[in-house]
Amino acid sequence: MNGEVESRLRKYLERDKNGLRRELLRVLLEGKKFTTSEIHDILSRRGYSISPRGVSAMVGLISARLGILKTELGEKNRYYLKSEYADLVRKIVEEFE
């Protein structure tokens, strides 16, 4: 299973034209739970130009295709990196720096 996740994560980052995908994964590596609005604010402060809907699409793709996020349902859903993937994600993100 981890081999499949690793392969998909590498392909995801290979298509990262401006570093936005890598930065989103760095945010998730902080180990907190975030709403898409909070992620949007963080990415905007770090100089990335993306709409709130764009952030939602990226988070949805990471959750559905890569399977490395957990969702805490509520009035506003909160997303966080599954702890078992933190080391793998960190290693691959560093390779793409």
From Swiss-Prot:
InterPro entries per record: Uncharacterised_AF1218
Domain of life: Archaea
Designated name of the protein: Uncharacterized protein AF_1218
